[in-house]
Amino acid sequence: MAIKYFLLVNIRGKTRLSQYYESIPFEERPAMESEIIRKCLSRTEIQCSFVEYKDYKVIYRKYATLFFIVGVDTTENELAILELIHNYVEILDSCFDNVIMFNLDKAHFILDEMVSNGDIVEISKQHILEFVNLLYKQE
């Protein structure tokens, strides 16, 4: 399993979306998220977007007022994860006008289409958007 978790955090440090692919006890998640978020938000824009945390890496990218944070195994390719984040952001931009907070179920669904059990399974923006549009058109 390469990806351990995927977090979407605002610039105030509040978690807006979290998806875990590794079993982390629910009671430990807030403290862990808080520490990781602090590490990422305290870094300057000229610093590297990769941070070592315990026995894995944290890869993050800032878009507007949101931080996309992904925890991965130490063997995972950092650039591939940055590309995954960028692809996810492009798909979210295609699906939502500005605010995704009113459609978190759809944001989770899109992420589930891209990542399954910690592995990247789909990166085609076109395929994901076709499936999302088909599913949500039926509602």
From Swiss-Prot:
Q: What does this protein do?
A: Probable component of an adaptor protein complex. Adaptor protein complexes are vesicle coat components involved both in vesicle formation and cargo selection. They control the vesicular transport of proteins in different trafficking pathways.
Which protein is depicted? AP-4 complex subunit sigma
Give membrane topology per the record.
Peripheral membrane protein
Gene3D superfamilies from the UniProt entry: 3.30.450.60
Report the subcellular localization. Answer: Golgi apparatus, trans-Golgi network membrane
Gene Ontology biological process terms, A to Z: protein transport; vesicle-mediated transport
Quaternary structure per UniProt? May be part of the adaptor protein complex 4 (AP-4), a heterotetramer composed of two large adaptins (epsilon-type subunitand beta-type subunit), a medium adaptin (mu-type subunit) and a small adaptin (sigma-type).
Q: Which family does it belong to?
A: Belongs to the adaptor complexes small subunit family.
InterPro entries reported for this sequence:
AP_complex_ssu (IPR016635), AP_mu_sigma_su (IPR022775), Longin-like_dom_sf (IPR011012)
Task: Give the GO cellular component terms, alphabetically.
Answer: Golgi apparatus; intracellular membrane-bounded organelle; membrane
PANTHER family cross-referenced by the UniProt entry:
ADAPTOR COMPLEXES SMALL SUBUNIT FAMILY
Query: Mainly localized where?
Result: Golgi
Is Transport one of the keywords?
yes
Instruction: Name the keywords, alphabetized.
Output: Golgi apparatus, Membrane, Protein transport, Transport
Source organism per UniProt? Dictyostelium discoideum
